[in-house]
């Protein structure tokens, strides 16, 4: 684990560390924010750490990740945890979405396992859920968002990441992986949670 450099500063309300090593998530979050907010990834903040996700709920994992970075960097930050919940699989993979097929976080294997477990199952309903924890002055604030949809039988599309290639959101005939980032943001669970985060940050700036 590497600590933030001594000259690292992130004290402005509109500059926040995003407690993730997932560059795809950083790109999505940045696409949802305007120029009034600056988001730093862990790497950009000089922090090299793999934060554990030991809990059974998205909320607890988001809080844990945000709290770890807040204590480490001594500055405001936020974290998110996202899970795919499939009704026919009793809401699996859920909090284990990134490690569904093993600790190596291989999403090709994760998708293959998901499709195998759903083989011949006619109930394909699923939803993505995102929970964001914003930590300011040691206080945690929770924001969530969800996107309902369907798991298709075969992968489609080359964009996105994770389970995007097999998830079709309600109201669309495309998988997330077939959409541009702008299209995906029309449905995105992450966008819905991020919009709540932004609204809260704007109220703080007015105070």
Short names for language-model regions:
Residues 14-17, 23-207:
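Anionic-ligand binding patches
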